[in-house]
From Swiss-Prot:
This is Protein-glutamate methylesterase/protein-glutamine glutaminase 2. It comes from the Bacteria. Residues 159-351 form the CheB-type methylesterase domain. It catalyses: [protein]-L-glutamate 5-O-methyl ester + H2O = L-glutamyl-[protein] + methanol + H(+); L-glutaminyl-[protein] + H2O = L-glutamyl-[protein] + NH4(+). Belongs to the CheB family.
Length: 352
């Protein structure tokens, strides 16, 4: 089902999805009220949902769906700061992935992004909705303008050099998995670098949201940011992130370049660079997601002496990326999501 107040979007998206023999669009409606009437007759397997619509917004509709009958939802959002912020609310409420659209040139854009849209719907159709977690804990508000923020970056960084790096890669279902994982970590966690498949603009909002609810710091990575204990760096959408070493410091390098495994940022790019410059001083985790991005990079990490862990099938929203890594022999361990925070801290204490 397509729910979008733009007739052009509905028309073009319906034509694109119906071209795939594995997809049937049962309806394309202008707003959530029409959608609910239609769903009373026939419930869809996947919903492609706009955010900003008349009569009822997409996030409100999404919450109603998740309360009544959890269903895979792909958010179709405009590439704006406001759209990114609202989309983060939708992902937190249970949406599984994002497809972006511009404010102008919609028809041409959707045609160009046909494969991305089709792949997003197919990935959503495989989602295990029992593993989509709505936030259970209240948002923790943490003061960020105190003494810590007044210490010059260089001084605090040099005194808090991380010797260990945790590299994490994830895609579909990863926003919920990362929220669960990072919220569980204490402030003495090792430095963390993350690739979450997500479009540009959205990663900044995602990092800000995580930072507001986690004890550790979370931010969108910038070129030459240091990897520090108690801090997670999220790769910016539309760029690759690589780990590099400068003396005793680990830094991240943010670069442009071609898509790798159809993605930018790519998990393989992060994992391979981590294997090269951190070796056995790193640990790699591949979490829920569609496709095979990260499998070969995780194998490189394992071959370089790093512990490597894949999320198990039962706890994944989509068991794609971990499955490929396991099949390649890249995973030294297979663990449920609930045990991964403890595994990160166990690794940190073993290395101390």
């Amino acid at each position: 089902m397509i729910v979008d107040d733009s007739a052009i979007v509905r028309q073009v998206m319906q034509a694109i999805l119906n071209k795939d023999p594995g997809i049937e669009v049962i309806s394309a409606v202008a707003d959530p009220i029409f959608a609910m009437n239609r769903m009373a007759i026939q419930w869809p397997d996947v919903i492609v949902l706009d955010i900003e619509m008349p009569r009822m917004d997409g996030v409100t509709f999404l919450r109603k769906i998740m309360a009544e009958r959890p269903t895979p939802v792909v958010i179709c959002s405009t590439l704006t700061d406001k759209g990114a912020e609202t989309t983060m609310q939708a992902l937190s409420a249970g949406a599984v992935s994002i497809v972006t659209k511009p404010k102008i040139g919609l028809k041409d854009f959707i045609q160009d992004a046909a494969s991305d849209i089709t792949n997003a719907v197919k990935a959503a159709a495989k989602a295990n909705m029992s593993n989509i977690r709505a936030p259970k804990a209240a948002v923790k508000v943490r003061e960020k303008n105190g003494v810590e923020s007044l210490i010059p970056c260089g001084a605090s960084a040099m005194s808090k050099t991380t010797e260990h790096v945790v590299a994490i890669g994830t895609s579909t279902g990863g926003t919920q998995a990362l929220e669960f994982l990072l919220k569980a970590l204490p402030t003495n966690a090792p430095g963390i670098v993350v690739v979450q498949h997500m479009p540009e603009k959205f990663t900044a909002s995602f990092a800000e949201r995580l930072d507001s609810i986690c004890d550790i710091r979370v931010s969108e990575a910038r070129h030459n940011d240091r990897v520090l204990p108690g801090h997670a760096l999220i790769a910016p959408g539309g760029k690759h992130m690589m780990l590099k070493r400068s003396g005793a410091q680990y830094l991240v390098e943010i670069i442009d370049g071609p898509l790798v495994n159809r993605h930018k940022p790519s998990v393989d790019v992060l994992f391979r660079s981590t294997a090269k410059c951190a070796g056995k001083n790193a640990v790699g985790f591949i979490l829920t997601g569609m496709g095979d991005d990260g499998a070969r990079g995780l194998k490189d990490m394992l071959d370089a002496g790093a512990p490597t862990i894949a999320q198990d099938e039962k706890s994944c929203v989509v068991f794609g990326m971990p499955k490929e890594a396991i099949a390649l022999g890249a995973a030294g361990k297979i663990l449920p999501l609930a045990q991964i925070p403890q595994e990160i801290m166990r690794y940190a204490h073993l290395k101390d």
